[in-house]
Amino acid sequence: MNLDIKSYSVLQVLPHLNSGGLVSGAVEISEALQKTGMNSFVASAGGRREREITKAGGKVINFSLGSKNPIIMLLNVYKLSRIIKKYKINIIHARSRAPAWSAYFAAKKMGIPFVTTFHGTYSIQNKLKKKYNSIMVKSDRVIAISRFINNHILSNYNIDKDKIVTIHRGINIERFNYLKVADERLIYLLKKFNIPEDSFVVLLPGRITRWKGHILLIEAIFKLQRSDIICLFVGDSQGRNKYYAELEKILNKFKLKNNFRIIPNQSDMATIYKLADVVVSSSLDPEAFGRVIVEAQAMGRPTISANHGGGSEIIIDGLTGWLFKPGDADDLSDKINKALSLNKDNRDKLAINAIKRAKLNFNNETMCAKTLQVYAELANK
């Protein structure tokens, strides 16, 4: 860098700081900025992960950025412009569409570089929706979180491919380390979730929403006809009470209610992963990246993913896990059976391969370093 990094300030904008991949990315980049000697600012409506940013030295500026109301978005342009001026912001980085519109015009007004991270495919069912999404490619640099997202952008938007940089999401390898999970925590959770010690645990982490494929996994477990399987759905329902009730109804229909646990999001996911004999990502639509797959593999868990989206970039089929035909309960059932049938030697080999790949390709440090490099390139133009 040719500039004094200690006076260099980055403002990230996003709707909230509760949960999800874009929130994790914002928190991690904020911490990396502070560690490097730069100044991190995050504008959002706040949330439960806000303290992680402030604890690391970053500053959170709370106001609503998630509204699609044009008047509020226009007001946010002026709010962001004042923040840019007050804190001498050098780059503004948007991680969501509504904040990106305000950030784009604020960046133009104040003459600073604008970065976006394309976190999902976003719905493009009509021209108006596609126009709304297009703000994510109007930046000076677009970060795609996987090769799948990179290809999606090029296929659907008019953009110079050289403006896009693919930076795979990363995880905290130290946090997701199976050696650091205490046996006492495992015993506690086995009791808490009423899991018999001789059971095989199948885990599906993620929001309780239809496209995550919970019903598909129920069908796959039913096809196995095994009474020794306990399946955990771990994630927030976010008020989707109808879907939750539908899952309960299907479990009753298949007489599987005693084999399933629907559990709210847990802070200690490393222990949840270690409980599992198999971790499944059964998403019906392609995952933009698939962070839970990486987390599970870093923990050395046998992992199964639908063969589309980011999952197919993370798993090497048969070496670090298995890929199944998307939406195919029979194929998913077969892969679960393979995972549960591994002998100790083959299970250990798979764990070694999975951990090595997660550490090498999907670690937090690499993700943050590549993102900060994007900032540096724009700053030095």
Functional labels for PLM-detected ranges:
Residues 6, 12-72, 163, 239:
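N-terminal strand-loop element at the rim of the active site
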Residues 20-31, 200-223, 245, 330, ...:
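A conserved mid-protein helix/loop that constitutes part of the nucleotide-sugar donor-binding site
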Residues 43-48, 171, 205, 230-245:
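Glycosyltransferase donor-sugar binding loop
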Residues 94-100, 118:
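Short His-centered aromatic/hydrophobic patch
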Residues 108, 114-145, 151:
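A conserved, positively charged/aromatic
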Residues 244-264:
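Nucleotide-activated donor-binding/catalytic signature segment of Leloir-type glycosyltransferases, i.e.
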Residues 317-318, 322-329, 338-344:
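Conserved acidic donor-binding segment of nucleotide-sugar-dependent glycosyltransferases
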